[in-house]
C-alpha cells in the first residue's frame, strides 16, 4: 500500500495549521511592526505597555524578521514532529530539516517587507501590482499574496518532509 499521499496530506495540514498559529498568534507585535524596517524607511515602534519608542532601521528590521522566522519555524517543527508522531507517521530527520529550511528561508524572503521587496517585485512582474496594493473593501492584496506564497512553499516543504516517510 502506498501511504505517501496520506503522509503528504498529514504533513501539509500540520505545517499549514502551525503556520497560521505562528504567523498570527506566536509572532510578537514588535516583530510584526518592525520586520520590514530599513534605514531609508525606518519603523518607530511604541511599546503598548510602556509607551517607550524604539526606532528600527535595516539591522533592526532584519533582526525582527529573523526572530519571527525562528519562532515560526520552531512552531512548525514542533507541530509537524508531534502531530506525525501522534498519527503514527515516521519522518526522516533530514527530510524534516529540509522541509523546515524551505519554509523558514522562503518565509524570511517574503516577510522582510522592505520597500520594493521580493513579493512586490514579483507582483509587478506578474501583472499583480494593483492587487498587491489593494487595501480596501476589507481586502489586503499584499497579505493575500504573502499567504499564497507561503502556501505554495509549504506544499514543497510537505513533499520534502515526507521523503522516506513510513508508518511507525
Residue map of PLM features:
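Hydrophobic alpha-helical transmembrane segments
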Residues: 1-168
Amino acid at each position: 500500500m502506498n501511504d505517501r499521499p496520506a503522509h503528504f496530506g498529514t504533513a501539509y495540514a500540520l505545517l499549514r495549521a502551525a503556520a497560521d498559529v505562528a504567523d498570527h498568534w506566536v509572532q510578537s507585535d514588535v516583530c510584526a511592526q518592525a520586520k520590514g524596517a530599513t534605514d531609508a524607511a525606518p519603523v518607530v515602534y511604541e511599546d503598548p505597555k510602556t509607551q517607550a519608542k524604539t526606532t528600527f532601521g535595516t539591522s533592526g528590521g532584519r533582526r525582527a524578521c529573523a526572530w519571527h522566522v525562528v519562532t515560526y519555524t520552531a512552531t512548525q517543527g514542533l507541530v509537524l514532529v508531534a502531530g506525525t508522531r501522534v498519527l503514527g507517521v515516521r519522518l526522516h530527520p533530514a527530510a524534516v530539516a529540509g522541509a523546515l529550511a524551505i519554509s523558514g528561508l522562503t518565509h524570511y524572503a517574503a516577510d522582510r517587507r522592505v520597500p520594493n521587496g521580493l513579493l512586490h517585485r514579483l507582483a509587478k512582474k506578474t501583472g499583480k501590482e494593483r492587487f498587491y496594493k489593494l487595501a480596501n473593501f476589507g481586502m489586503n492584496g499584499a497579505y493575500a499574496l504573502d499567504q499564497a506564497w507561503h502556501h505554495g512553499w509549504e506544499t514543497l516543504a510537505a513533499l520534502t518532509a515526507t521523503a522516506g516517510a513510513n508508518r511507525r
